[in-house]
Swiss-Prot record:
Organism: Mus musculus
Motif Shuffled ATG8-binding motif 1, residue range(s) on this chain: 266-269
Localization per record: Endoplasmic reticulum membrane; Cytoplasm; Nucleus; Cytoplasm, Cytoskeleton, Microtubule organizing center, Centrosome
Cross-linked residues, Glycyl lysine isopeptide (Lys-Gly) (interchain with G-Cter in SUMO2): K447
Name this protein carries in UniProt: CDK5 regulatory subunit-associated protein 3
Length: 503
């Protein structure tokens, strides 16, 4: 018998209410009686004496049977003057709370209510709070990751912007104006290139002599455009065409298209609808399209190139429309007023002749190398002195000079300047291309700031939920101890264990 009293009673918490009903500790209609008790409690708490402990019991917690017992004990002190010779109280306050205690004890209603509270806390309230806290922590990690992505993406796009600006030779402070300013400086740059052609006289004569020697008969002069620029410099098309210098040059006016939206006025649009989670956290809607793929930007080797739809060679095929009517004699107007290196047709001829001369000199350097066969050397024994008096080093030096001139004329920066010169509205396309990178950088920076704010909101929400969870766990543990102690009394002090609470 003594061993039987020490055998613990293990009760699964989820089956606790059924266990009480099956063992007739309470009846099936306990819920209706609990509703009546709750109504009486709500009425009784409207008239309570001034007491700090009573106020603490009534604030922010569910009032159950053991709270009522404590309130009755406190009222015995405050309502002592209303006690008669028979030990009863005439105070309505005391009568109300004594009635509530009596109703609780009827059919052990207090016990089943406590068990109901315990089951609800263990099965619903505590898991719900834990889920909300876990959601806050998940959001913080997600926002932290997006913050890092936004920061890295903003830096990458900004670097691409300045790298592209460097290719164009501008600072990027005002892309449009700087590009137009470069076009205004283009004539002086082309004049320098034309002046650089003056050092090619020896190479041109060498090529002319070789052609005459190989053909074994007098021929017309080779490289006419290159010869002309070498002697006259970068003159006007009119002078090249007519052979006389114009008395008046009416250059086409560079049309400046109207200013577009200010560069610092960026329309961020709408960040989309935000969804509110169960915990009150405002989470970013998954459907938001930021229009930016960080992975593709990092892998795209041609990110700094503009796709203009046609072949890149089309840049050199743009023709400038002639303005006005036929010009009188001595007046250079329209395309005639442009310089040879500004006008696409003559510029292309100049570049072609530079490349032709470069190929010739490169081939002569190869023929003069040590690996050259004896036959090619013997062929030039009867050549003019200008051909025989050359060295490989001299050929390579001339080739280097030609390559520098070709490189300056065909560089990506120069191609874009020629396109701007031919079509000023091309400036807007380049400006939009460059500004798009800067706008994307600023958008990613703003997104990063937004992620920081959302991360802070999630952290604050977690900080507000954790004390609630701690308080609920404490109250639930108290309920568990009270229930285990009450059931233990009904079974001669046998230990009672409520299983599955995981507190």
């Amino acid at each position: 018998m003594q061993d039987h009293q020490h055998v613990p009673i293990d009760i699964q918490t989820s089956k606790l209410l059924d266990w009480l009903v099956d063992r007739r500790h309470c009846n099936l209609k306990w819920q209706s009686l609990v509703l009546t008790i709750r109504e009486k409690i709500n009425t009784a708490i409207q008239d309570m004496p001034e007491s700090q402990e009573i106020a603490q019991l009534l604030s922010g917690s569910y009032i159950h049977y053991f709270h009522c017992l404590r309130i009755v004990d406190l009222l015995k002190g405050t309502e002592a003057s209303t006690k008669n010779i028979f030990g009863r109280y005439s105070s309505q306050r005391m009568k109300d709370w004594q009635e509530i205690v009596s109703l609780y004890e009827k059919d052990n209603t207090y016990l089943v209510e406590l068990c109901s509270l315990l089951v609800r806390n263990v099965s619903y309230e505590i898991p719900s709070l834990k889920k909300q806290i876990a959601k806050c922590q998940q959001l913080q990690q997600e926002y932290s990751r997006k913050e890092e992505e936004g920061q890295a993406g903003a830096a990458e796009m900004r670097e691409q912007f300045y790298h592209s600006c460097k290719q164009y030779g501008i600072t990027g402070d005002n892309v449009r104006r700087e590009l137009l300013a470069l076009v205004k400086d283009l004539p002086s740059q082309l004049a320098e290139i034309g002046a650089g052609a003056q050092s090619l006289g020896e190479a041109i004569d060498l090529y002319q002599a070789c052609v005459e020697f190989v053909c074994d008969s007098p021929t017309e002069q080779v490289l006419p455009m290159l010869r002309y620029v070498q002697k006259k410099g970068n003159s006007t098309v009119y002078e090249w065409r007519t052979g006389t210098e114009p008395s008046v040059v009416e250059r086409p006016q560079l049309e400046e298209p109207p200013e577009q939206v200010q560069e610092d006025e960026i329309d961020w649009g709408d960040f989309g609808v935000e969804a509110v989670s169960d915990s009150g956290i405002v989470a970013e809607t998954p459907g938001i399209d930021w229009g930016i793929s960080l992975e593709s930007e990092a892998k795209d080797a041609g990110a700094d190139k503009i796709d203009w739809g046609d072949d890149a060679a089309a840049a050199s095929e743009i023709t400038v429309l002639e303005t006005g009517t036929e010009a009188p004699e001595g007046v250079a107007r329209g395309s005639d007023a442009l310089t040879l290196l500004e006008y696409p047709e003559t510029r292309n001829q100049f570049i072609d002749e530079l490349m032709e001369l470069e190929i010739f000199l490169s081939q002569r350097a190869v023929e003069m190398s040590e690996e050259a066969d004896i036959l090619s050397v013997s062929q030039f024994q009867l050549a003019p002195a200008i051909l025989q008096g050359q060295t490989k080093e001299k050929m390579l030096s001339l080739v280097s000079t030609l390559q520098q001139l070709i490189g300056r004329l065909t560089s990506l920066r120069m191609q874009h300047l020629f396109m701007i010169l031919a079509s000023p509205r091309y400036v807007d396309r380049v400006t939009e291309f460059l500004q798009q990178k800067l706008k994307q950088s600023q958008l990613l920076a703003l997104k990063k700031e937004l992620m920081v704010e959302k991360q802070q909101e999630a952290l604050q929400e977690q900080a507000a939920l954790e004390p609630k969870l701690d308080l609920l766990l404490e109250k639930t543990r108290e309920l568990q101890k009270l229930i285990e102690a009450d059931i233990s009394k009904r079974y001669s002090g046998r230990p009672v264990n409520l299983m599955g609470t995981s507190l």
